[in-house]
Amino acid sequence: MAITDVVIYPHDIFRKPNSDITVFDENLKQLSEDMFETMYKNEGIGLAGPQIAENKNIVVIDIPEDDGSQGKNKIVLINPKVTKLEGDIVESQEGCLSVPGYQDKVERYERCTVEYQNLNGEHCTFDNVDGLFAICLQHEIDHLHGKLFVDKLSRMKRDRLH
């Protein structure tokens, strides 16, 4: 498995369009494993294609267990789309592997529904999820649409990041 470098904000790759994945093969499985390894090495819970210079619509997520361990909740989302945002808008502390050393409070919907394909190309849905998983889904899928969590901050806070 290959651990790759995480692309750091404000790299222009984050603003480029990403392409849907249409071939579901061993190369895609290897890409997802490489993404997990890179995410774990950098102590993350989610990683999107553009963060490793892959302008493809792929996201990997692994929400830690209560004891902080990872590996039991590995999820790969291919061509994910948020189809519904529900509930209150909640504020939570977020960070990003592409913005190392910085965290801030960000507002997101408390629940979401996401449609995606798995590694076999089968269509799947996470329906009305909440908590950290919902926040992580919204955060990572934002990457696929050229948005980072820092885009939700005030201009003054963003300017301090450069």
How would you name each of these model-derived features?
Residues 1-162:
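Positively charged
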